[in-house]
Amino acid sequence: MIKFLVDSASDYEKTETEKKGILRIPITITLKDKNILDGEITKDEFYQLVQNADELPKTSQPSPQDFLDVFEKAKENDDELICILLSSKLSGTLQSATLAKSMVDYDKIHIIDSLSATYVIKMMTEYGIQLRDSGKNALEIVDELEKMKSKIKLYAVLDTLENLKKGGRLSTVEAGIGTLAKIKPLVTLTEDGKVGMKGKSIGRKKALADIVK
């Protein structure tokens, strides 16, 4: 059977992956010296914690063993596994998965570097499920997903400058001036999977319009 595996940067809630039969590897979040496995709290709870924290949370990639446990079970069940993971330029998650694959004598594990994050990974996974259900084999699905990722562009509007200040990218004064001026930074993921600046806009409405251009 063809199955899909994502990490928790995929924008899927834990309950959603369980319902759809998607395997999910969590990322560890460290906030205020407390380690939380992504999925143990909801997105809203996480955003509330970040908003109330003085510093931004830190994340750590899953270990090779986390993937190895899943890969060995796939081999045991003779499942074909398609892994769609967070951009290799943003995390070492893909490196951990690749190392784990090298430790399993099994050629039915396929690892895709999404070169993206969040909802893009979810879109790719949902499309992969559609292809599987239409009768495509794993290699055909991987080929289609590799083509798909080059056609998707991820943009985001930063609604507040507070997190840039917490992360040390802006001073308190700069953040204050930017907030008063209603500056909204536009960020994107480049073709090679890195975070890049698209520009700045005045006001949320203008920022969203600039993304569409």
Ranges and model annotations:
Residues 73-81:
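Glycine-rich phosphate-binding loop signature in dinucleotide/nucleotide-binding domains
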